[in-house]
């Protein structure tokens, strides 16, 4: 079994480095991303959710460099996840109409207001690999997983995640979008969306999840249970651009 895992990881590494002959892994080459989880102020969950739903058309109209934008909800936490064509597009987004409107309304809608409730929760990242979105607007549920590399293992974890996008594209038709992210030298994340919970269940029983689970004790701080599973956060999707 271990030999099979090592052989598969070797194949993944080859995929990650052979960029000219595997076009699908470059679907978001040089793209950036951002994730912000924001606690709603007391009594403002519904109002905050409505605000985010109303923001989606504005993002579409005013931010051509924002490739994807998702408004998300997990009970009293609202979140935004977005993908940008480059760093400049991300900067434009944060100085745009929607960011300005959120700034103006943050004191009322967000626990902690703009600085403590929004800015302090921004996680910017670079895209390592992705499965290009399909049937985007049929998605109803999303998952975000934060992952910290074990000491000295960030490079190997980055290699695995970089190679995983094409595998998801080849083997997971129910995963409608999947992206691996690097936040900083040691921290990574995965974001994916599904039409329903059956798609998520299939994903977590899939090949990439199996490879990550097999290597988590070596590559991930806390291993599989404490370093991956404990950091899984599921969301309902409120709106998509």
Name every feature range the model reports, one short phrase each.
Residues 1-9:
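Bacterial N-terminal signal peptides that target proteins for export
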Residues 31-39, 79, 140-148:
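Active-site-flanking beta-strand signature of metal-NTP-handling nucleotidyl enzymes
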Residues 19-23:
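Sec/Tat signal peptide C-region and signal peptidase I cleavage site
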Residues 121-147:
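Surface-exposed beta-loop interaction hotspot
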Residues 9-17:
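Bacterial N-terminal signal peptides
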Residues 54-70, 83-121, 167-177, 193-232:
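An amphipathic, aromatic/His-enriched active-site/gating alpha helix that lines ligand/cofactor pockets
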Residues 38-50, 147-159:
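Short, surface-exposed ligand-recognition loops at beta-strand->loop->(often short) alpha-helix junctions
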């Amino acid at each position: 079994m271990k030999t099979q895992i090592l052989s598969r990881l070797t194949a993944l590494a080859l995929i990650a480095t052979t960029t000219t002959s595997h076009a699908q892994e470059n679907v978001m080459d040089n793209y950036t991303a951002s994730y912000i989880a924001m606690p709603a102020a007391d009594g403002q969950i519904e109002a905050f959710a409505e605000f985010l739903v109303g923001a989606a058309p504005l993002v579409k109209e005013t931010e051509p460099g924002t490739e994807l934008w998702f408004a998300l909800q997990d009970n009293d936490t609202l979140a935004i996840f977005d993908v940008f064509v480059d760093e400049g597009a991300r900067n434009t987004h944060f100085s745009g109409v929607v960011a300005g409107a959120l700034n103006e309304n943050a004191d009322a809608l967000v626990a902690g207001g703009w600085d403590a409730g929004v800015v302090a929760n921004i996680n910017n990242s670079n895209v390592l690999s992705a499965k290009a979105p399909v049937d985007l607007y049929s998605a109803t549920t999303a998952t975000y997983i934060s992952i910290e590399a074990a000491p000295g293992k960030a490079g190997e974890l980055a290699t695995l995640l970089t190679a995983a996008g094409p595998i998801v594209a080849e083997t997971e038709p129910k995963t409608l979008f999947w992206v691996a992210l690097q936040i900083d030298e040691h921290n990574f994340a995965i974001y994916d969306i599904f039409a329903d919970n059956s798609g998520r269940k299939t994903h977590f029983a899939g090949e990439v999840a199996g490879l990550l689970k097999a290597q988590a004790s070596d590559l991930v701080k806390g291993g599989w249970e404490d370093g991956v599973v404990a950091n899984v956060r599921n969301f309902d999707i409120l709106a998509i651009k």
